[in-house]
Amino acid sequence: MSTPKKTYSSTSSAKSKAHSVRVAQTTADAALQAVFEKSGDSGDSFDYSKSVSKSTAESLPSGAVTAYLQRMQRGGLTQSFGCMIAVEGTGFRVIAYSENAPEILDLVPQAVPSVGEMDTLRIGTDVRTLFTASSVASLEKAAEAQEMSLLNPITVNCRRSGKQLYAIAHRIDIGIVIDFEAVKTDDHLVSAAGALQSHKLAAKAITRLQALPGGDIGLLCDTVVEEVRELTGYDRVMAYRFHEDEHGEVVAEIRRADLEPYLGLHYPGTDIPQASRFLFMKNKVRIIADCSAPPVKVIQDPTLRQPVSLAGSTLRSPHGCHAQYMGNMGSIASLVMAVIINDNEEDSHGSVQRGRKLWGLVVCHHTSPRTVPFPLRSACGFLMQVFGLQLNMEVELAAQLREKHILRTQTLLCDMLLRDAPIGIVSQIPNIMDLVKCDGAALYYGKRFWLLGTTPTESQIKDIAEWLLEYHKDSTGLSTDSLADANYPAAHLLGDAVCGMAAAKITAKDFLFWFRSHTAKEIKWGGAKHDPGEKDDGRKMHPRSSFKAFLEVVKRRSLPWEDVEMDAIHSLQLILRGSFQDIDDSDTKTMIHARLNDLKLHDMDELSVVANEMVRLIETATAPILAVDSNGMINGWNAKIAQVTGLPVSEAMGRSLVKDLVTDESVAVVERLLYLALRGEEEQNVEIKLKTFGTQTEKGVVILIVNACSSRDVSENVVGVCFVGQDVTGQKMFMDKFTRIQGDYKTIVQNPHPLIPPIFGADEFGYCFEWNPAMEGLTGWKKDEVVGKLLVGEIFGMQMMCCRMKSQDAMTKFMIALNTAMDGQSTDKFTFSFFDREGKYVDVLLSTNKRTNADGVITGVFCFLQIASSELQQALKVQRATEKVAVAKLKELAYIRQEIKNPLCGITFTRQLLEDTDLSDDQQQFLDTSAVCEQQLQKVLNDMDLESIEDGYLELDTAEFEMGTVMNAVISQGMTTSREKGLQIFRETPREINTMRLLGDQIRLQQVLSDFLLNTVRFTPSPEGWVKIKVVPTRKRLGGSVHVVHLEFRVSHPGAGLPEELVLEMYDRGKGMTQEGLGLNMCRKLVRLMNGDVHYVREAMQCYFVVNVELPMAQRDDASSQM
């Protein structure tokens, strides 16, 4: 059930909200199951649609819910296509088995055992006595493994008959459960235990999946269902996606032509209970061979306290409710695979916790009994892992798009506030309906109404506002997908047109509203339409009755309000509420400073220290580092790169990287690196080859693995590229020689020479056969401790393996790389990380190559590791720290830019109020000066694209203005600082300047003159100092009545003047760029855009800026304008 949210939150509340939804859904699941079981006992029919609606409103005692969950996991029944035996964790003593186990295992019936017969199965039997010696060895090895699932399936043979079976083992709380399935002659037989062998079956599907372009989840889902159907042969394969409210949707489907389509079907959350979803997280591939077959009872040790858990068993029997559902839709067999992705949530401390969540399911249905062998099911499960990886990337891409949406929304909010707030946000375009997806919106302000789209009537909105003030008076707003569930008394009067609402309080009695219609309006089902003569039986469990039940559940409910939408609404609310406060409110200032402190930004001194440390590291690093400017010319060449190439620093500087220094085969690679890096796209782990010079020439080329880093100035403009490299020449030579050797490779692999990289290998069955000395040194594990173990599952894995990996995604990527090599395709420089024997985190690059025999047949895989030097790691660490500081500074700038706009709106509003009063001439002049200063501030705040100023293609405004107004505004901006320093500002301008009307960009002219004036004031000695601004106009006739005015502005002051470095920064010749230097630099470029120029002159007694611009005079009809 939906509950209203009284305050707005973002991702920090998502986890608790999702938990609440799941708890409520579990209760509904239990209630629905209770109704089903009760109807079966009494003989009454089970009305599915009505029961679903009723279950969502019922509450059950916690004991009843717990009992329901226990039955789901410990039902005591299995399917008949295999058998189950549970044994103790040590000793293999049988504690439970399915009744059909003797038959499946070809044992003598228990009722008439022969004298001395060992092949009997009962509680207490040692299960090892039932299988051959080699089978027992395999089972014992699996029992010792930490990650047992990666060893499945284990091929075993019955001792008596020799019958071959797949054993699928997993651990439970009291021991080990082993499922046995017969190996059929037409099965995809794997010749050894382990997941790696099974995964080969999905190689083609994985290759196709990885080749898909990004940004299209629909195409990804369509491809997955196609590949799964080709692998398994089921009549129908669908991809289900779970929505935030736990209901599901069919987003992709491939089916037999005569079957009814279900694409687009939405179904209530109870169709796949929470308990089942939990089981899918544990057992990710679930098969039902024949839902009509009678289940098999499990016999267990009577001393056990509760039924054996079958949560992870491949044979767990379907519950009656689900079996009936399948039968009603004409499906006899099914295969369901979990699609699991990362789930990043912020905890209460603000740190990100990475978990896993069920995104959806890939479901296969068949109209007749069907059993898919375990190796193929395992391959499908691995395909789902790859699918989950692809989905993770798509989700991250969607998150980036969401970030862009937030930025666009913030721009929209600022645009709204430049108007007549708050009326402008509903009376102009765009308006508040463009802020979030809705069917209607309203502003209730000062007992007046502004309505947009589909909304309640004015009287109904007033009633909602009064209800909010009475029942939610302590909240800043309310959002709900159901006004009825939020207990609004008159919700029934609003109809289907208004179900969901988000309300934001902007004053003590005024509100903004957004409204949404019922969800059913948004739902479209692509299924076949009913014949008018047919009647649905909504009482039966069937996809159509599920759809009907879903529509019944959501008929008075809208789509939920997403967190990003509530953040946008909350932002607008805060800004609007702030616009009704005094702009000098000290609380606002306190809030701004507190926010800045929370960002924990480094100051400029700390940034300088980091930068200096970075330079020192680059110059002294034993890693080769080089840098180029935007034209590709060398402007950085450290001692290490000079050493390995034989080219001294003095000879390298100024040479072209592409034309002079890289080999011909690397030209295209380096050109691409430069092109991308100069656009801000940084590539990593790219191999390039450099020429050698002098004494190094005889050694041949230098091979580097480089990371390309964009070099930026303080304005975040890319001005060059830095390459941080690792010299792998020696390792590459050995690797090339190694892969060319046809016979004995031991002399290379086992050579302890430091240039030999860490190397390990696995045979075609996934067992480690090579682990060289460098690998021993890197991991801490000796060769004799790992050889013979499964590479994935015993050496590398998620649990207490020899080399534990950090995440499931990392292990999946490793397995993909191994499978790719087994398929004959090498993987080069793949990022690979694990924990060594001492628990130290190791971060390396992995390259894989196929291993072949003399006939060219692939017999395994070789893996080579490349380790980054400590100097390179430190240099990259400092680089990341510098980038982090830069990002933090940008966040601070963006925040300040946003917060300045709010009080600026208040200033504008106050000035507009004053303009409507009776003012003297002096007062009117003050207001005019204030107005143009506001315009200047607004212009600067909107300067998001400094690059256009630097490159000289910024479009200047052209409008008529009065020069006297400009001078008043310029001088007013310098008055506060000059008074603080005890300086006087003298203004020397001809009288005609005050009334001279010109054409041009008034605000930009005002901006540059005020910047030059303020810098002059800052560097004038005080007290008793002075600053003088002088204007000399010269009129010119261009022909006819067209005149231009050449204006020379001279801003002078006594003393030593501006620091020389600051003046150099103005001319782009400084070593760095300070904030003051950046301002002067931008102003000089703005002057040049006006076809003017600026100089700074030093004389014996004074220094001064000289600014020359030429502007056309405005055409006047009166005679005074004529020469």
From Swiss-Prot:
PTM info: Contains one covalently linked phytochromobilin chromophore.
Domain PAS: 610-681, 744-815
Primary location: cytoplasm
Subunit structure: Homodimer.
Name used for this protein in its record: Phytochrome 1
Function according to Swiss-Prot or TrEMBL: Regulatory photoreceptor which exists in two forms that are reversibly interconvertible by light: the Pr form that absorbs maximally in the red region of the spectrum and the Pfr form that absorbs maximally in the far-red region. Photoconversion of Pr to Pfr induces an array of morphogenetic responses, whereas reconversion of Pfr to Pr cancels the induction of those responses. Pfr controls the expression of a number of nuclear genes including those encoding the small subunit of ribulose-bisphosphate carboxylase, chlorophyll A/B binding protein, protochlorophyllide reductase, rRNA, etc.
Annotated GO biological process: chloroplast avoidance movement; detection of visible light; red, far-red light phototransduction; regulation of DNA-templated transcription
SMART domains: GAF, HATPase_c, HisKA, PAS
Key word Cytoplasm present: yes
Residue ranges constituting the Histidine kinase domain according to the UniProt record: 895-1115
Taxonomic superkingdom: Eukaryota
Domain GAF: 216-395
Localization in the cell: Cytoplasm
Family as reported in the entry's similarity comment: Belongs to the phytochrome family.
PANTHER family tied to this protein: OS08G0260000 PROTEIN, PHYTOCHROME 1
Keywords: Chromophore, Cytoplasm, Photoreceptor protein, Receptor, Repeat, Sensory transduction, Transcription, Transcription regulation
Family matches, as Gene3D superfamilies: 1.10.287.130, 3.30.450.270, 3.30.450.40, Histidine kinase-like ATPase, C-terminal domain, PAS domain
Comp. bias regions, Low complexity: 1-15
GO cellular component: cytoplasm
A Pfam match: HATPase_c
Positions with a binding annotation for phytochromobilin: C321
Organism: Physcomitrium patens
TM helices/strands, residue ranges: none
Residue span of region Disordered: 1-20
Molecular function per GO: phosphorelay sensor kinase activity; photoreceptor activity; protein homodimerization activity
